[in-house]
Amino acid sequence: DHLLPQQTRGRDEHQPAMPWRQLPLFVATSVYTDEPYNVTRALLLMVILTATRSGEARGMRWAEIDFHKRVWTIPAERMKARLQHRVPLSRQAIYILENIRGLHDELVFPSPRKQQILSDMVLTSFLRKKKAVSDIPGRVATAHGFRSTFR
């Protein structure tokens, strides 16, 4: 019933996660858009499609993406565990990236005004605004919570 195995080590505080059965409707009604480019929505879709931490996705650089092999290689210095991580990119993830390719030189999802890494509050604000349902009553889902949606 889960895509990824449960973690075996002790956990820190649980982040509110969206129940996986509700994810397709949420994406279809609140995230997916026909807009040519909306940095927040594109970033959230990438977080969901890759099950990566939002900080890893916010810091994604074009040089890390191999379109031919459909792999995103996150350097060790940007990973929590300090080990290089290779993320396979689905057809949908490649589609998002191809639609925004060439818009920015280095960062894939830069802040529109400053061309630097987006604040971690961008996704939090979006999810609050959309009242993203979570597995914790009275709390909205968090970007980090999407990682546990796949466990």
Where are these regions (language model features)?
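Well-ordered beta-strand positions in beta-sheet-rich domains
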Residues: 71, 84-88
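Basic, Lys/Arg- and aromatic-enriched nucleic-acid-binding interface segment
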Residues: 1-60, 68, 79-83, 102-103, ...
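Residue-level detector of conserved, well-ordered beta-strand and adjacent loop positions
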Residues: 75, 90, 110
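Major-groove DNA-contacting interfaces characterized by cationic-aromatic clusters
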Residues: 1-14, 94-128, 132-138
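Short, basic (Lys/Arg/His-rich) helix/loop patches that form interaction surfaces
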Residues: 28-41, 50, 87, 99-107, ...
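Active/binding-pocket-proximal capping segment
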Residues: 64-66, 89-92, 147
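Short, polar N-cap/turn motifs at the start of nucleic acid-interacting alpha helices
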Residues: 63-71, 138-140, 144
